From Swiss-Prot:
Entry keyword set: NAD, Oxidoreductase
Protein known as: Probable aldehyde dehydrogenase
Tissue: In uninfected plants, highest levels found in stems. In plants infected with the flax rust, highest levels in leaves. Higher levels of expression in infected leaves than uninfected stems.
Active-site residues from the entry: E297 (proton acceptor), C332 (nucleophile)
SUPFAM superfamilies per the UniProt record, alphabetical: ALDH-like (SSF53720)
Family in the record: Belongs to the aldehyde dehydrogenase family.
Any one biological process term the GO annotation gives: proline catabolic process to glutamate
Origin organism lineage: Eukaryota, Viridiplantae, Streptophyta, Embryophyta, Tracheophyta
Amino acid sequence: MYRPLVARLLRDSVATRKGSSHFARRFSHSLPFATVDAEELSGAKPAEVLNLVQGNWGGSSSWHTVVDPLNGEPFIKVAEVDETEIKPFVESLSKCPKHGLHNPFKSPERYLLYGDISTKAGHMLSIPKVSEFFARLIQRVAPKSYHQALGEVQVTQKFFENFTGDQVRFLARSFGVPGNHLGQQSNGFRWPFGPVAIITPFNFPLEIPVLQLMGALYMGNKPLLKVDSKVSIVMEQMMRLLHYCGLPVGDADFVNSDGKAMNKILLEANPRMTLFTGSSRVAEKLALDLKGRIKLEDAGFDWKILGPDVNEADYVAWVCDQDAYACSGQKCSAQSILFMHENWAATPLISRLKELAERRKLEDLTVGPVLTVTTEAMLDHLNKLLQIPGAKLLFGGKPLENHTIPSIYGAVKPTAVYVPLEEILKVSNYELVTKEIFGPFQVVTEYKNSQLPMVLEALERMHAHLTAAVVSNDQLFLQEVIGNTVNGTTYAGLRARTTGAPQNHWFGPAGDPRGAGIGTPEAIKLVWSCHREIIYDIGPVSHHWEIPPST
């Protein structure tokens, strides 16, 4: 199915392109869908990010400049629409009916179309030149190690592979229940919302928007996608790849804007459902503005508990380091607080964590710029924590050295601060200690067997319930902790982690009816479709039937 596409890609890669400057630019990088070269992005060769609406790519009246997070050089110009330019996007969404672009009774062949698109897109991302392109582009705008960036591409590829062939139409599987009499039967269907919106953050420029965009499209919706402008170049290029793989250009719109303009689009277009991934503050505002027509995957102050059984100390330390500091802690699933059983506190765990954290360096981006929290803000938070009685700095707590990261971003060494459990629970301290710092920063504390109820109390009082880890193979301990907590994605066992949002299991919060999942069939059906019941009652009516008395 995808062989002609791949052959075309390879043929285009070696062909000499002539003609207009557009095509020279478009194909100069040997990838027929690409309009940029990740390696060449610079102030001297800035890239441009456009908008897509009603099947056409276009600019705006003004350009927003994105600076290189590693050196501060302006290197990307984003065509951000302002409040006077939103009409085409509002009209485009408004043209989509509530019953969607397809549903089980309308254009069912489009389920097969999206199976084909997924097949082609998955294979495209398996081509080393293509996966390298996206991994490097991610690194340029959301600096993380190459391993982390490539992992994001690979998860996206596997997601596409999961929804090839008939798998898209299987998402719309219905059921039937026998009725009360001959000719009656009730049938349940998954139904699209129609016009929808997707808003995604900077930290996963490819994985989050692709998985949510495709989920929306699979179920028959028409989405308007907005990605944080700092990183939207990645998804703009992915949209072009999807068009190359057969995505109809009018099926999805792509907009660059600030929050104010996007909010106005939502209020005027009135999408039937909006998916928001990002900060809790914005999430709560949108929930009010959109009158509840929203699904959220917002901030997470994610916890890890080390149980009483101490095993594989080096492995556990390595996972803790990865959970807290990979991507410079800029994951919504990053380990924010570590509860150590006293048995673990008696081991060299903290010194091992310190050694692992100190291996991280800017040169390979195992630590790097923090895009939403400044250095001053992180150090100020640290200093406030250190005012708590018994608190102490375990490691880090200093700015990165010898760098050119602009001051609008953060640059600190991986940091851990110890706060006594008794102090954490105090009303005067709790909100401070559990404030999410979206950077390489974690709180560490210790507990005894008798203090497990205190740990559970601390978890119960948290507001966000995204990911969690219970590191123990003690079945009774696991049962106690899992039974008294709520986090939507909870890893349990010796190898438990807080991070890792692959395509093979649910990732999302629990405990909130607005909670959104991502990636799996269950998540797609929950977020991007609703239940519709159709009751057939075709008769026959008995020949002996008579009009009964009124009731």
